């Protein structure tokens, strides 16, 4: 038995589209009800369910034979399918005496400070009221440029958002193998304690899903995200949902490799693509990396990209290495006149709104360790 599972009081479970849908792509209510029966929380335990399946559930009603490739049709399918998905969850959990609440998140909700606080407060209150949050990315409004992109990473972010004790990633594969078990002999990797345990492994082609976007590679990345922030994660199949939550030794465990930190910083480090780059001198690199200071304009030597205030940008050292990533406080077009200058000088010339950081330390995450 695994005491870190049986002792967990707040658990996030993620289920993929392939575990909830028929071969034709529609919602399989029987499979959904079986999943609900398997993940019902124990007395004193709180459950958060991150569920894919909205787009897949919308395919059949819209007469679509397969998952659409264009964002607009995906959003239409999500809009149609989400209501059906949550209605089915509400009915299944309701028969067991549990209330559910729908929560749709976008990347903005976990990266902007005010959105992040509001999302965390809302989820905490739902759990305090003994409600099971059913979470999905808000596919109907998320843009291609700023979206989480798969529910595996969203689940890892949510696990930190709610300070979960455990993250369980369910799919159609019962764990991580050293080769594709469908193509030949393979050995399951039972435990991952560091990235070196993943050396030489391939994660392509290990699933059968045709209606989702998450494969084994995204599950590994999500488990690493969770572990790097102090949350234990397990990858296993939906068929193993009940055994894994009972503490049986199934699936692959990713043990914590770091301490807990804000979910939005994990999102910055693992799930964002930078919109630009700020080149720093050696003094600014030392301030940001070693002293964990905010980035001031005096230490910036160059700007790349066409970004807006609030976008993620990489901070680059004189050797061209990205040492940190943060949310920039100014548009790219505003920065050239600010480079290499003190905030006091800028305030005198351009006004008091320029007497502030380019990237605040609270909006910054290191990509390389301090040396």
Curated annotation (Swiss-Prot):
The entry marks the following residues as binding substrate, namely 52, 139, 151
Q: Which InterPro entries match?
A: AceGlu_kinase-like_sf, Asp/Glu/Uridylate_kinase, G5K_ProB, Glu/AcGlu_kinase, Glu_5kinase, Glu_5kinase/COase_Synthase, Glutamate_5-kinase_CS, PUA
Q: Name one GO molecular function term.
A: ATP binding
Q: Which GO terms describe its biological process?
A: L-proline biosynthetic process
**Which residues are involved in binding ATP?**
14, 171-172
Which keywords does UniProt give here? Answer: Amino-acid biosynthesis, ATP-binding, Cytoplasm, Kinase, Nucleotide-binding, Proline biosynthesis, Transferase
Q: Where in the cell is it found?
A: Cytoplasm
Give the pathway listed in the UniProt entry for this protein.
Answer: Amino-acid biosynthesis; L-proline biosynthesis; L-glutamate 5-semialdehyde from L-glutamate: step 1/2
**Location, primary (coarse class):** cytoplasm
Query: EC number(s) on record?
Result: 2.7.2.11
Q: Which reaction does it catalyse?
A: L-glutamate + ATP = L-glutamyl 5-phosphate + ADP
Origin, by domain of life? Answer: Bacteria
Q: Report domain PUA positions.
A: 275-353
Q: Which CDD domains match?
A: AAK_G5K_ProB (cd04242), PUA_G5K (cd21157)
- Choose one Gene Ontology CC annotation of this protein and give it: cytosol
| Pfam families to which the protein is assigned, alphabetical | AA_kinase (PF00696), PUA (PF01472)
Q: HAMAP family from the xrefs?
A: ProB (MF_00456)
> What NCBIfam families does this protein's entry cite?
proB (TIGR01027)
Q: What does the UniProt function comment say about this protein?
A: Catalyzes the transfer of a phosphate group to glutamate to form L-glutamate 5-phosphate.
The protein's matches in PANTHER family, at most eight in alphabetical order, are given as: GLUTAMATE 5-KINASE, ISOPENTENYL PHOSPHATE KINASE
Q: Which family does it belong to?
A: Belongs to the glutamate 5-kinase family.
The protein's name: Glutamate 5-kinase
Q: Which gene encodes it?
A: proB
